[in-house]
Amino acid sequence: MTDTRRRVKVYTLNEDRQWDDRGTGHVSSAYVERLKGMSLLVRAESDGSLLLESKINPNTAYQKQQDTLIVWSEAENYDLALSFQEKAGCDEIWEKICQVQGKDPSVDITQELIDESEEERFDDMSSPGLELPPCELSRLEEVAELVASSLPSPLRREKLALALENEGYIRKLLELFRVCEDLENREGLHHLYDIIKGIFLLNRTALFEVMFSEECIMDVIGCLEFDPSLPQPRRHREFLTTTARFKEVIPISDPELRQKIHQTYRVQYIQDMVLPTPSVFEENMLSTLHSFIFFNKVEIVGMLQDDEKFLTELFAQLTDEATDDDKRHELVNFLKEFCAFSQTLQPQNRDAFFKTLSNMGILQALEVILGMDDVQVRGAATDIFSYLVEYNPSMVREFVMQESQQNDDDILLINLIIEHMICDTDPELGGAVQLMGLLRTLVDPENMLATANKTEKTEFLSFFYKHCMHVLSAPLLANTTEEKPSKDDFQTCQLLALIVELLTFCVEHHTYHIKNYIINKDILRRVLVLTASQHAFLALCALRFMRKIIGLKDEFYNRYIMRNFLFEPVVKAFLNNGSRYNLINSAIIEMFEYVRVEDVKSLTAHIIENYWKGLEDVDYVQTFKGLKLRYEQQRERQDNPKLDSMRSILRNHRFRRDARTLEDEEEMWFNTDEEDLEDGEAVVPPSDKMKNDEDLMDPISKFMERKKLKDSEEKEVLTGKASLSGRQSPSFKLSFSSSPKASLSSPPTASLHPGSPGSPSSPGTGARSSPPSAAVTTKGGLVGLVDYPDDDEEDEDEEDADSKEESPPLSKKSKLSS
């Protein structure tokens, strides 16, 4: 027993009534102790894993189809199939199944599950086999009634199928059909329609093989033309013999393959066009017909794939300049149908199929075809290209990068695709939408590979932006040279919307490539011209593009927007929209609201300083007033850097016990002996600390008023020379100005960061000569608020660290805002 005889594919039927390939392996039968019976075992040929372990159940109905298939149901709605490479292997396993069930191996079905009552079951089993009436014109009505009455009962269906098969009854019926048609016997033809339709519902492969044979299939189709419910018969045979004539674009040397193609086309036609739409109850009775077509297609693709001579000739003629247009049109359509057939294959089979086409040069052939003027040929080539991109985008990327080294940009495959998208003549741009989807798949980094030797993402995106992006953006740049789109018709706007949507996708998924392109080519300005379009969908596309850029919170983009005043067309579109409450209104408000909520300082300042006059009267939302408040708070912090320091002090008080990563200087500071600080030296002037806590509880608008009040109080205390407590020693005064400890206690970066707490030069703390008096004034207050003086030393240290971390970004943002 050779391996090939037992080599099988395991299939399961999914919810869509399509067969899923579960793998290839070798089948055997053996007794399985766990299952308590003889079982079918399939082990994968790749790794020996168990693909199938199925007990041969005495009550399960097994069917043998097309000599190499065994089909059965494991449970409700769970069908299995074994497809054998060789008929001999199928026969061996079939004999084993029949042996376990005690059946004759000559039958093609062992039994059917029965859902009738026990009484009906025993009546049927005890009755003799079903006897068919003589096949005569006068008995056709009786035959039709017999078929109709047998369909509800599984056992009667089985007996009817066996009788039809054993007596060669179908061929006799088809002879009567020819007689009735010659005699124009309409009543007999109607009975034959009912009989043949009923035979389809018997769901038997053996009967289908007779009906779909070369000598019978056209007569079967003829019987189904005479539907009693229609006043006139259909003309299916006329269509199949004249309109749908078979053309061998490349001669097929294998007669079996040619016959299989004919048969599959006609059976598919019967299923799709001839048979009436099955009812809910009839749908499951046609499962064998679905399986027949499916396995035929698998067989055809396999036979063509193995015929290297055929495929070599096909691609040679496709790319040959001497091939005339009609011939090339036929070749492309054949290749399209060939690829469509491959969609019935399972993933591993489809991989092998497309790998074969790739090795034969399918992408080179498509490049030639897409450069032709024939619209139909290009359309078919586009469909083939879509199959390839969906199957393996990396294969397509690798090809286009290789060809870029040899060809000009104009004839690159991707640029040809882009040009077809731009030149789509369909008013609804159906082809352009399809091609844009393919481009998106190709430039999507999510399906790009990264290996140790090369990064596909980097290489392909560099190629795309260098060789293809200018072709894609050409219609956009050509149409946005003025303040309004030069062409604003519906079809042009649809195309521009597709282009902008792809650019938006690039902004989201690409990094420096798209950033450099947008800034160097001033793409955002051009896109925002589209906000003046009369078509709202295009204006919204432009707004989405800008919103995606702002959402990145990238200062390169922000500076580009501010430098070129790119909020101007947005504000103009908002004001031109007036009081209309629509998507444009909402989209623009949401954009400004995002800037406010995310506190994008540079854009906030830019918007208020340049566009506030146009927006200040908008009061039906608080977005713009909120932006103005943000701006004023920002200016307040610039004018009073101490305000940021206050916030950091409160934050340090609240979170000072949290674990933090400290720099070396901070570690040294915390490791200093705390006794050195117990003599009254304060890390932060206590008066400042009290004042900070109090100020932050009040609105910022009252800050200056309170500051003046505090300053006046400090001056009064200084003038009055208030007495000091025991802890308020002269050394405390010196610690701020001249003692060696003062340099340790005061923030070491005070000169670099004027806004640091405790710095003598901090704005808003009074005159430059007043810090000692401030310290004297509020030392007593410090003792009342904080229990332990050494806590203050820790607080001051954390304030210093925080000011180091926060001050540089604040000063940078201030420069952007000014």
Swiss-Prot record:
InterPro entries: ARM-type_fold (IPR016024), EVH1_PP4R3 (IPR055236), P4R3-like_central_dom (IPR006887), PH-like_dom_sf (IPR011993), PP4R3-like (IPR051137). Residues 703-718 have a biased composition (Basic and acidic residues). Transmembrane segments: none annotated. One of its GO terms (biological process) is regulation of double-strand break repair. It comes from the Eukaryota. GO terms for cellular component: nucleoplasm; protein phosphatase 4 complex. Residues 670-818 are annotated as: Disordered. GO terms for molecular function: protein phosphatase activator activity. Keywords: Phosphoprotein. The modification Phosphoserine is found at S769, S770. SUPFAM superfamilies: ARM repeat, PH domain-like. Residues 729-775 have a biased composition (Low complexity). The keyword Phosphoprotein applies. Serine/threonine-protein phosphatase 4 (PP4) occurs in different assemblies of the catalytic and one or more regulatory subunits. Regulatory subunit of serine/threonine-protein phosphatase 4. This is Serine/threonine-protein phosphatase 4 regulatory subunit 3.
